[in-house]
Each structure stands twice: as structure tokens, then as C-alpha cells.
Swiss-Prot record:
Domain of life: Bacteria
Domain Toprim stretches: 81-176
Zn finger (C4-type) location: 57-72
Lineage: Bacteria, Pseudomonadati, Pseudomonadota, Gammaproteobacteria, Vibrionales
Record InterPro entries: DNA_Rcmb_RecR, Rcmb_RecR, Rcmb_RecR_Znf, TOPRIM_dom, TOPRIM_RecR
Matching Pfam families: RecR_C, RecR_HhH, RecR_ZnF, Toprim_4
Protein's name in the database: Recombination protein RecR
GO biological process: DNA recombination; DNA repair
SUPFAM superfamilies listed in its UniProt record: Recombination protein RecR
PANTHER family tied to this protein: RECOMBINATION PROTEIN RECR
Function: May play a role in DNA repair. It seems to be involved in an RecBC-independent recombinational process of DNA repair. It may act with RecF and RecO.
Length: 200
């Protein structure tokens, strides 16, 4: 069956979302047109407004409608002197959900990947260098993903922190709560053993 040009365009546009293939895009498009046109209009308006009005914080690079985000403007967070470095704005949401961090953030918007042509300036490390040079950051917590690229990025940033004499630590990663050792991969178990904590 030949579909209309506008319908094809809608389905193709929906495929830009992660995990959405041709069938999922078709299902979404048909649902909006058959059962929820009002929701579709609201979605279109919200997307249009978000795309035009949401930018990056001038301090930490997370998403915000203002020049500087609320976290960076918070005096208590400024006073803590702590900075948590993450790969994406979604990681900020995850860290905030723990309730264990009360400092500021710096979002890389990715990680170092020389094979893909992604170098230090592509993930804002020149801006991070400038931030560290200001002298108001007393400790850096590296919360990049536990991948080869994430580890390489953390190592690079740790060296940058050393140049500025700012203490840097890496978040622990290892055996998950409720996990069984026999099901944990060797690399994760190695990190758990190396990052063990004394009980007494």
C-alpha cells in the first residue's frame, strides 16, 4: 500500500528517536493520526518550543532555558567546591536521584574517541581547563561511564586536574546490590576487588 508523502515524512521523522525502527515509527504515526490528534499537536508544539528555546548552560553545559542553570546558580552548591563530571545531561538526573551529591556539574556531551575523531576540544575539555583555572573547584568527581572510552576520558581529565592541583576521584563501580558473583563479568569483578573498602 502506498502511503501519503506527509505520512512517510512523519514516520521517517519519528525514526530519529533511539530504538525506533520502521515498524515502531509506523505504529506511533498511525496511533497519533487515528486516536490522538490532540496529543500529536501538543507533542509538535512542545518539540518545536524545546528545540528553539532549550540551550546549554554557559557554566556546566547541561540543558537549560536560561544562560546559566539553576544548579550552577545555587549558592550552596557553589560553596561546596565539588564538581561532578558526567557524559550527558541524563547522568545529572541519575546522580541527583541518589541525593548524595550537593556540588556542581560539568557535562562532556560525550567521551574521548580518537577512532571516531572525537578529541578533547570536542567534549569541552578546553572549557573544563578554564573552569579549573578559576580556582573555585576544590574536588572533582569523575562519573564517566565504565566503558573503555569512559575510562580513557576519566584518565585524561585526572591528568588535567593534577596540572591544576585539584584532587580528582573516580566513582566506584563493581558488583551491583543483589547481584550474584558467578553472574558478574570478570572486568566488573576485577574493579570490585581493586576498589574494595576496609570494614575495620
Amino acid at each position: 500500500m502506498r502511503t501519503s508523502g506527509l505520512l512517510e515524512q512523519l514516520m521517517e521523522s519519528l525514526r530519529c528517536l533511539p530504538g525506533v525502527g520502521p515498524k515502531s515509527a509506523q505504529r506511533m504515526a498511525f496511533h497519533l493520526l487515528q486516536r490522538n490528534r490532540q496529543g500529536g499537536m501538543q507533542l509538535a508544539d512542545a518539540l518545536s518550543q524545546a528545540m528553539s528555546e532549550i540551550g546549554h548552560c554557559s557554566e556546566c553545559r547541561t540543558f537549560t532555558e536560561e544562560d546559566t542553570c539553576a544548579i550552577c546558580l545555587n549558592p550552596k552548591r557553589q560553596a561546596s567546591g565539588e564538581m561532578c563530571i558526567v557524559e550527558s545531561p541524563a547522568d545529572i538526573v541519575a546522580v541527583e536521584a541518589t541525593g548524595q551529591f550537593s556540588g556542581r556539574y560539568f557535562v562532556l556531551m560525550g567521551h574521548l574517541s580518537p577512532l571516531d575523531g572525537i578529541g578533547p576540544s570536542d567534549i569541552g575539555l578546553d572549557l573544563l581547563d578554564h573552569r579549573l583555572n578559576r580556582g573555585d573547584i576544590k574536588e572533582v568527581i569523575l562519573a564517566t561511564n565504565p566503558t573503555v572510552e569512559g575510562e580513557a576520558t576519566a584518565h585524561y581529565i585526572a591528568e588535567l586536574c593534577q596540572e591544576h592541583q585539584v584532587p580528582a576521584s573516580r566513582i566506584a563501580h563493581g558488583v551491583p546490590m543483589g547481584g550474584e558473583l558467578e553472574l558478574v563479568d570478570g572486568t566488573t569483578l576485577s574493579h570490585s576487588i581493586l576498589g574494595r573498602q576496609k570494614l575495620y
